[in-house]
Amino acid sequence: LVWPDLVARVADATNAPGMVAVYNSVNYMDPDNFLWQSYHSSQAGSWANASQFKNAEIDKLLEDGRATVDADARKKIYDDAQTKIVDAAVELWLYCEIANDAWVTQLGKTPTNANSDIRLLEYSAS
């Protein structure tokens, strides 16, 4: 199944495959970045929420987390959301990639975007 066909099929719950292998990562270091696209009901049928998962209680937690600026309060909200997602057995997480990345200062300064995947960073020699 090629990617465009998969994206089209998961949009319709009656046509979606029973199992989909998807690698997903964050664009920036915030739980909202991953959890919203993967588990908020508004995203059901997108490639990131191919399971068509919908849960009003988790939606409320994710919405509260998105609207809260206090770091400790946000952590509790997202901890609760993640526990409920795991308890709902939404998906089967097979593994998490562990990567050890390094760079040498002779290549330039630190990465230009410290919140991004280091494999995608650009370096400046100046």
Give a label for each model feature.
Residues 9-126:
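Detector for C-terminal structural segments
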Residues 1-8:
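Short helix-initiation/N-cap motifs at beta->coil->alpha
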